[in-house]
Structure formats: structure tokens, C-alpha cells
Amino acid sequence: MGKGVAVLNSSEGVKGTIFFAQEGEGKTTVTGTVSGLKPGLHGFHVHALGDTTNGSMSTGPHFNPDGKQHGAPEDANRHAGDLGNIIVGDDGTATFTITDCQIPLSGPNSIVGRAVVVHADPDVLGKGGHELSLTTGNAGGRVACGIIGLQG
């Protein structure tokens, strides 16, 4: 089994730990807890780069090895890194489990070394009608990020 982890921090006080697990060539399960967010939906994506030299702004666009448009996790036409939204409760904390087939921990499209990013606003999943809907999900600013590393 492949395992990965990302520790999220930000200057805005958002913190979290995200775990990734993949059995063989199967789907990857993402589990995590993120705190310090405003209640509601927040876009959640794997970004192309593991570069945090300028915080989350240097993590590049959504991970998109197949050159597709932005979409929902269940859409056939979507970025590999489009993981939808996490739901934050009234206490400012999100606890979640996501299973996805496009974010492997090994091989040419591995997400290891890339960044996971939490956004300020909901991801409209490519269906919002805004010009950014098909590129970023119009999910607003980047409020926290962490680099996905291998876990022993």
C-alpha cells in the first residue's frame, strides 16, 4: 500500500493534516481534518507544483496531466486534481474522506511532490457560468496548502 501525507499551514491560521492511501493500482483514499476555516464549502484541489516558496500562490494550477477543463470529481471531463469541496462546520473544522481514481501515489501521474490546496470559497465544479468556472471552479483565493510527501 502506498501512503502519503500533507501538513497544511497558513498565515491566516488554517491548519490541517491530510492522509493519502492507495492499494496497488486502485483508487486513492484521502482523509483529513482542516481547522481555522469559515463555515461552509471550500474548494479542495491537488495543484501541479510542490513549490511553496511564495506560499500557496507558487503551487501552480490544478494538477491536469490530460489537459481537460475543470469539473466535479464525478465528471469524466475534469482536472485530475479536482477533488470538489470540503464541508466546514460551525466550529471552523472540516473532517472528510474522499476516494478518487485520478490521484495515484506512484507512476507518471503521481501526486507525490505536488501540493494540496484549500480555497476560500466553494468550487462551482465547472457549472457556475463564470469565466473561471472551467479553469479554477471559481473557488476564490488559496487559504492553505501543503506538499504531499511519502509516508512510511
UniProtKB/Swiss-Prot annotation:
Matching Pfam families:
Sod_Cu (PF00080)
Could you state a single Gene Ontology molecular function term? superoxide dismutase activity
Instruction: Give me the Gene Ontology terms describing cellular component.
Output: cytoplasm
Sequence ranges of Basic and acidic residues compositional bias? 65-81
User: Where are the residues of the annotated region Disordered?
Assistant: 53-81
Which top-rank group of organisms is this from?
Eukaryota
Subunit record text: Homodimer.
For this entry, the protein name equals Superoxide dismutase [Cu-Zn] 2
